[in-house]
A protein has these predicted regions:
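A Trp-anchored, charged/polar loop motif used as the substrate-binding/catalytic surface
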Residues: 1-11, 115-126, 275-288
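Catalytic-core environment of secreted peptidases
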Residues: 98-113, 117-182
Length: 453
């Protein structure tokens, strides 16, 4: 049924660009983040790898709702024990949770359950999942609020979102929870796709996630004082609430760069299937401006988005190493490294069997770090530090890790191409410096040629 809903409009007009949005979920808590038959179908439809001419698709899925009013009354503790519903664990989809800014209600003697900017009482999280599985939700949008008095908790129209009615007897109705949130996300995705029709679905997903920020209320709910704290924050709130204007435009003190590229992760040798390519992206930092800022704090945000092909075997869903066709990683050159030393370090990491420890090193400036950030097929991290220190980095590598294209050589997929989208931004909130103008002429030279491992 799900597959038919996807293919039917494409039969009528196959070349039209679309965003597929689904708010239908299953509530059986049996997967704990592991891929299911349903989520694997979403991943397969998204990447479309088996088609003669692949036509990738972007799926926006609701995270699923908490419907038990008793749980609303136990907010916010209830958020950590209500898992994201199937197929929200899909690697390739954009899974959407809910937060709320709605705190004004018309009912006397009731007060809002959630503070302004906090997670909605209706949203689900991935806190109960095994930590190896993807961070979900990816982002959160407005999903409405609940209200309580001294006796019970309920939802009211004044705390919900206005929408059109399905009934012919009325024009408008209200909606809430992650269904409403996922609809808002699909709208943003459609706006981005209309503005940048040449961008891949992976890039649209990256731009939405890259533009998200946590509200002060989210940071109060889940203080991120260390890397495990950031992981807990993301498993509840995703990367925060996206901003369409931030996704569409670079501003004076903030610069966003987008690269769509590909590499061949593996090759067949006499000694078996080995890693093949890494891509070096020369980041056109405005070096003079960054060096002049010296100790001024700047923020670098990196988002790597790609679609994996799910393992055709049912056994593949049991492990994050066996489920995806391939995995990609990113790492930035350290301040004290030469370019040759950086390449050597990344080569060693790519050849590592599980590729989890070769790039960790000094991760102090990163919110998550190399060990935490590489889950699923959407990786994001934030580097914070002195502008002069960032000016000395300048290169970012994208390289392969383990996947079944490598481990299942009999399927002859080891020579497949892996496409990806990379979004990088620099933000200097405390400085009055025009970062955009400084690099405008350098953007076309972002990517160095692939380097064979």
């Amino acid at each position: 049924l799900f597959s038919s809903a996807v293919t039917r409009p494409e039969i009528l007009n196959g070349q039209r660009k679309r965003i597929f949005s689904s708010a239908v979920t299953a509530t059986a808590y049996r997967d704990f983040g592991r891929p299911s038959a349903w989520s694997s179908m979403v991943d397969s439809l998204a990447v479309d790898a088996l088609a003669e001419t692949p036509f990738p698709r972007l799926f926006v899925l609701s995270a699923g709702n908490i419907v038990d009013r008793d749980h609303w009354g136990n907010y916010p503790a209830s958020l950590s024990v209500n898992q994201i519903h199937d197929p929200g664990q899909s690697w390739n989809a954009l899974t959407v949770g809910a937060f709320t800014d709605k705190v004004e209600l018309n009912e006397p003697e009731f007060i809002p359950v959630a503070d302004q900017g906090a997670l909605s009482p209706f949203t689900t999280t991935s806190m109960g999942w095994e930590p190896v599985w993807p961070f979900k939700p990816d982002v959160v949008f407005e999903g409405g609020n609940a209200a309580a008095n001294t006796e019970f908790v309920d939802n009211f129209a004044s705390l919900e979102l206005l929408t059109t009615s399905a009934s012919s007897h009325r024009q408008f109705w209200t909606t809430n929870a992650t269904s409403a949130a996922s609809a808002l996300c699909a709208r943003m995705a459609a706006r981005l796709m209309a503005q940048y029709p040449e961008y891949r679905p992976e890039t649209i997903r990256a731009l939405i996630t890259h533009s998200a920020q946590w509200t002060p209320a989210m940071l109060r709910m889940y203080p991120a004082r260390n890397k495990s704290g950031f992981a807990q924050l993301i498993r509840h709130c995703g990367w925060g609430s996206p901003d369409v204007e931030r996704a569409l435009w670079s501003v004076k003190n903030s610069l966003t760069l987008v690269a769509e590229d590909s590499l061949y992760p593996y090759r067949k040798t006499r000694d078996g299937i080995k890693t093949r390519d890494l891509n070096l992206h020369a980041l056109p930092w405005p070096l003079e401006q960054l060096q002049e800022l010296q100790d001024t704090q700047v923020e670098l945000r990196v988002t790597l988005s790609y679609f994996i092909e799910p393992n055709p075997s049912a056994r593949g869903s049991s492990s994050r190493y066996h489920y995806p066709s391939h995995r990609l990683r990113f790492a930035m050159k350290r301040q004290t490294e030469s370019l040759d030393e950086f390449k050597t370090r990344i080569n060693a990491a790519a050849e590592s069997e599980e590729s989890e420890h070769g790039t960790t090193g000094n991760d102090d400036n990163w919110s998550l770090g190399a060990t935490q950030r590489h889950k699923g097929s959407l990786h994001q991290d934030i580097w914070r530090g002195a502008a002069a220190e960032l000016a000395s980095c300048g290169y970012l590598a994208v390289y392969p890790a383990q996947g079944w294209w490598r481990t299942r050589g009999a399927l002859q997929r080891f020579d497949s191409e892996a496409k990806y989208s990379l979004v990088v931004s620099i933000h200097a909130p405390e400085a009055d410096v025009d970062l955009y103008a400084a690099v405008e002429t350098l953007v076309e030279n972002m990517v160095e040629n692939p380097v064979e491992i």
